[in-house]
Amino acid sequence: LSRVGTFMIIFPAIDLKDGKCVRLIQGDFKQSTTYNESPLEQAKIFEDSGVEYLHCVDLDGALKGNFENIKSIEQIKKNTNLKIQFGGGVRNIERVERLINIGVNNVIIGTSAFENKTFFEKSVCNYPNRISIALDIKQNQIATKGWKEVKDLQISDFLKSIEDLNINSIIITDVMRDGMKQGINFEMLENVMVQTKIDCVASGGVSNISDLIILKKKNYSQIKGVIVGKAIYDKNIDIAEALKIVR
């Protein structure tokens, strides 16, 4: 997903669980709310509101490693013109290929970027500028496996190791703010951006339109987009208004 002009991309989030569109709080599967039984219907609602991009996560894939929810992604690609950024359970090259083949624009790799360097580097090499990294941060540590584990790996060391790869973006999520609507953790974003030249996407904590206004005013050259989830579903943010702000 390439930067379009100077405006930020708004990525409404669709989290997939058991074939439905849900939201979690802080990644806790026990705190799951179903917002739409049909991910395709939800995607069409977003498309009708003017967005061009979707951020989709397969929660079942992230936790169990299965790939059932790919059917929903195929339906969205066939029936809308939305560009899709997709992650969750992407742990081998066959899955990356399958996602690219069904039209996913940007494949997100999380856990495997930290645990299987060979696979990750091969994915980036095979699909330059189509792979993003999910950098999920939980109390200054890297969280993996559906945020159930933290890695004994310094964020700075990891960022150095990927600096020369042709990566699309780093998706920076504050796990503790995800679904909490507590506002964006700007300090965390800045701590990551100062250590890398790679484009970044902000995620976690967006609560209302003022968060987007502040993010836009900060004019970070590296922030290419922002992921918004619960605040849209709970109607704290109107997408049409949000799109005007980021442009």
Language model regions located:
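Conserved, mostly hydrophobic/aromatic
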Residues: 15, 46, 54, 99, ...
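Conserved anion-binding
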Residues: 22, 26-30, 105-178
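Catalytic cores of alpha/beta
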Residues: 84-85, 90-103, 187-189, 195-222, ...
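Glycine/small-residue-rich loop that forms an oxyanion/phosphate-binding "nest" at active or ligand-binding sites
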Residues: 68-123
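Alpha-helix-loop-beta-strand connector modules within alpha/beta enzyme cores
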Residues: 65-85, 123-135, 183-202, 207-208
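Glycine-rich phosphate-binding active-site loops on the catalytic face of alpha/beta enzymes
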Residues: 102-119, 204-208, 221-239
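Glycine-rich, proline-tolerant flexible connector loops at the mouths of alpha/beta enzymes
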Residues: 53-69, 172-182
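Conserved beta-strand positions in the central sheet of alpha/beta enzyme cores
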Residues: 55-58, 85, 108-109, 132, ...
